[in-house]
Structure formats: C-alpha cells, structure tokens
Amino acid sequence: MTRVFSGVKPTGHLTLGNYLGAMRRWAAVDQHRSDALFCVVDLHALTVDHDPARVRRLSRQAASLLLAAGLDPELCTVFVQSHVDEHARLSYVLECVATDGEMRRMIQYKEKAARERVRGGSVRLSLLTYPVLMAADILAYGTDEVPVGEDQTQHVELARDLAVRFNQRYGHTFVVPRATSPAVAARVMNLQEPASKMGKSDDTGPGIVYLLDEPDVVRKKVMRAVTDSGRDVVYDPEERAGLANLLEILAACTDGEPAELAGGYDSYGALKKDTAEAVVEMLRPVRERHMELSADPGYVDGVLREGAEKARAMARPTVDDAYRAIGLLPPVNAAR
C-alpha cells in the first residue's frame, strides 16, 4: 500500500488555503487509499522568533482541526512531530550527506532569511537546515507520496536527492518519495494581495480566511476581496489574479471549473456573494466539529498519544538502519 506523509506547521491559525490545498484531500482521498500519516510539525515552528506558549496552543489547535476536517484515527495516523524522537535523530544523519550549498539555494530559506534581516533579526541555523528536518520527516516513514503545495516541492526534491545519495553511498535504506498536489486550489491566494499565497503567518488578516472565522467574518472578507477595475467576469490568472482567485476558490468549493463558472456571472458582486456562501457552508461542519473536540481535550490527547506510538514504531526501524548504514555503533541490546 502507498504510504503518504504530510504535515502542518503551527506558526499561525490554519486557513482556507490549508484546507482547500491539503486538508480536505487528506480526509477525502489520502487516508482512504493509503497508509497515511499526518503530522503537526511543531519543531519547524522554532526556526524563527516565537512565543513558546503560542506554539503549544497552536499545535493543539492544529491537531484538533485536522480531526475536525475529517481525519479518522482509525484510518490514518495523526501525531505531533516532537513526540517522535526519530525525526530529530534522522535529521542529523541526513545533515551529514547534505551540503551547505544545497541549503542556501532553497528558495524559502532565501526569502525568510531576507525578511528576518530586514527586521533586524539574526538568521537561526535551524532556518538553514529546516529542509533537512523536513526530509527526515518524510524519509523516516518510507514515504511514497508527499501531498504539498507548489511552494514546498523544492523541499521534497531535496528529500529525494538525499535519499538517493544516502542509498548510493551506504546501501539502500530509504524509499525515494515524490511530491503530489491537487489540480484545483493547490495554492489559494491572499484575498487582499492576490499575488501572494494565503499564508497562516501573514500579517494581512483581512485577506486571510481562517478556518475558525465566524461566518459573518468570512462573508466580509470575501466581499471585500481585491479584484480589478474591469466589469466582465472572465478567468484570466495572469492578467486578473484577484478575480481568478475567487473563481478558483468557488470551483474548489463546488467541484466546478473556474473558466466555466465565470460564464455564469455578469457582476463581481454576485460572484463574491456566491463564493462567500460556498466557503461558509464548506467550513461550517469543520467549525462545529472543532467546537466539540475543544470541549473534549482528553480525546485529542489520546489520539495524539496513540498516533505518536504508531509513528514511532514505523520510523524506528528505518532510522536504526540508517544509523548502522552510516557507521554508528548500535546500543548493545540492539546489536545485530
């Protein structure tokens, strides 16, 4: 059976972009067709300045939202990255086959490091090595497929390169993974800045629809979405990005095609109204289930505890094999 691994980083409240770009497919498709693992990658949240209490709070919220979005612990494994030591263990070993040049060529590193310097901050080493930890997340589980947005495909390519390089140098140890992404709404854009991804860490709150936004807040944000000065509704991502973003969101909510949907509207207002209502109705069961889970923290704790145990049992043999392959002496009670 195909093994799938993907994760969410608790650096902000999860958004419509997270849901349409990843979480909905995880629940509707990936957990049913594969041996799937979904992880709250909290270690990745430490690469920049952060509030420890907020990271803990958002980690729990992210786990609850994964379950609220439809992930079923009976069908897949849901856990928190830092609860499974094998991620950190494997990350160091992979750093020993990665190169400094590879890390500095990562697009996200360049962008995030530049923003940090503009703010007058120092760039943490963990930001540079972030892609290696992500590779460890993937390779520890013998992952075949990694559902990601297009902004993360370079990191999956690095994981592939490190797996191949390690296998060639030290013997076959890792499955070589591949990135996958849905055709529609793989990258939902900011409603106020349609050239930018709708990111949970952004400061432009009016342009971001959060999964836990109240329905009236969702409606207000969509109705105020940036479009252009035109009047006709056409699907043109290159020239009319804001309008195209609304059509893509509506298409993702209704299983339609953006270009075909455009033909059914003669005004931006009507399109915005229908898009807002489609988003509200799609997110309604997620919000309601999240409220139920928030009232039962013991259930979420149990899911995460059992998920970590399952994940650890899957990852440990691969990580132990990697340690032996690269030349590390195993503990006496684990010697072969």
Swiss-Prot record:
L-tryptophan binds at residue 137. The keyword NADP does not apply. A motif ('HIGH' region) lies at residues 10-18. Keywords: Aminoacyl-tRNA synthetase, ATP-binding, Cytoplasm, Ligase, Nucleotide-binding, Protein biosynthesis. One of its GO terms (molecular function) is ATP binding. It catalyses: tRNA(Trp) + L-tryptophan + ATP = L-tryptophyl-tRNA(Trp) + AMP + diphosphate + H(+). The keyword Cell membrane does not apply. It comes from the Bacteria. InterPro entries: aa-tRNA-synth_I_CS, aa-tRNA-synth_Ic, Rossmann-like_a/b/a_fold, Trp-tRNA-ligase, Trp-tRNA-ligase_bac-type, Trp-tRNA_synthetase. A motif ('KMSKS' region) lies at residues 197-201. Its EC number is 6.1.1.2. It is found in: Cytoplasm. Its main location: cytoplasm. Catalyzes the attachment of tryptophan to tRNA(Trp). This is Tryptophan--tRNA ligase 1. It comes from Streptomyces coelicolor (strain ATCC BAA-471 / A3(2) / M145). The gene is trpS1.
